[in-house]
């Protein structure tokens, strides 16, 4: 499933990029085929993912540790399901 996550955060984009890469290396690769993180500005990004297990991805991003990171970094997101236009 092609997914877009529009995120805002209080940390720097560099810190957020590292967080996403670390998550993908440790856990996310089980649920995401590939991803592309795009910097909108220092505190906003667009993350495009090819999610192969939506339930697993949702569970992995909803752990107490992830929620604590979200809170500490002022993280907020809006998720969209993407479909190709023919």
For each feature predicted by the language model, list its residue ranges.
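Short S/T/G/P-rich N-terminal loop/turn motif that feeds into the first structured element of a domain
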Residues: 1-69, 76-86
């Amino acid at each position: 499933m092609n997914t877009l996550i529009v995120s805002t955060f209080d940390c720097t984009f560099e810190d957020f990029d590292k967080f996403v890469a670390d998550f993908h290396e440790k856990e996310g690769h089980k649920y995401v085929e590939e991803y592309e993180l795009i910097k909108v500005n220092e505190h906003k990004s667009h993350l495009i993912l090819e999610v192969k297990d939506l339930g697993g991805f949702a569970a992995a991003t909803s752990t107490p540790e992830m929620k604590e990171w979200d809170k500490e970094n002022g993280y907020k997101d809006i998720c969209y399901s993407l479909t190709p236009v023919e």
